[in-house]
C-alpha cells in the first residue's frame, strides 16, 4: 500500500499493476497501470493517490486468462458459470480497465460459460469458494481471477456488492447464462 509514492517498496517482480485501493469498476485502471520498474511504479502510485485521495496498491501483474465468477448463497455458495474476459488483439499486458467496463468496446469479448477443462473449472470453483469464505461474504459476490498458463489461479479482486444492472452487469449476464432470470437473481 502506497500513500505518498516515497515509501520503501518491497521487492517486486516486474511488471506490476498499480491501482487505487478502494475504487470500483476498475476506476483508475488503464493499460498505463502496468509498469516495468520501480520509478514508474512510484510515479503511477503518486498520480493515483493525488487523483483519488486514497492509497494505491502495487501488485505483481499476473499474465494469463481473466475470469469473473459469481457466487450466491451463504455457507456453501452456488458458483455460477465462470465468464472469461477475452482480450481482442491484446497488448503485451492487457487489463480489463474502467473504459472497457463502461463501453461496448471491441477490445474485449466475453465467453460464458468459459471454455475450461473439468480440472480448471474445479480449481476455479475451489478458489472462489475459499475466497468467499475467507472474507465472510454473504448472499452474493463476484470474484475476478487470472489463471496462468500452468493453471495457477490468482484472485485479483472480490466484489461483495457487484453491479446488478439487467443485461449489462457481469453478474446479471452470468446468471442469465446459468438459466436464472433477473427476478430470481434479485
Predicted regions and their residues:
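Active-site nucleotide/adenylate-binding loops and adjacent lid/helix of ATP-dependent enzymes
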Residues: 1-57, 63-65, 76
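Broad gene-expression machinery/nucleic-acid interaction feature
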Residues: 13-15, 66-68, 142, 155
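Short beta-strand elements
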Residues: 20, 73, 84, 159-162
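Short connector loops/turns at beta-strand edges and beta->alpha or beta->beta junctions
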Residues: 21-23, 101-103, 161-164
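Short small-residue beta-strand/loop micro-motif enriched in glycine and branched aliphatics
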Residues: 25-28, 107-110, 166-169
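Phosphate-binding site of ATP-dependent enzymes
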Residues: 38-126, 147-154
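ATP-dependent carboxylate activation and anion-phosphoryl transfer catalytic cores
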Residues: 115-186
